[in-house]
Amino acid sequence: MTQADVHNADELLGRWLNTNHETRGISECTVARDGDGWSVSLVGVGEDGPIRWPTVRATPLANVEEEAGQKTMALLATFDLGFMRAETHVRLNKGVFVIVLFVTFLDDSGRANYLNREFFYRQP
């Protein structure tokens, strides 16, 4: 990854809020950087209030967007919550923070695994 890629990745830093205030999924995401490392934390929506997911290390990925020739960086963060694993890809697309979530259930609940995509804006 080049220095320009890392610089562009700084645009991912900060606290991001879901554009859909009625989401039943992820309500916010925080991306942080310490040295050469990245971390991602999520807050989910629960019946009894916010559910804070553990902060995890993130792996930087090159994100070569075909639309408009964008070249940015994305992050891969995997959350293991015991009963489920969520592989999360976060990136910016034309100024909109996008989370793509691949959820695999690890328990015997019979729930279907799923894919979800949500959109976020930077907290002012």
Named regions from a protein language model:
Residues 2-6, 28, 64-124:
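Beta-sheet ligand-binding and adhesion/scaffold domains
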Residues 10, 17-87:
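Central antiparallel beta-sheet cores of small beta-barrel/beta-sandwich binding domains
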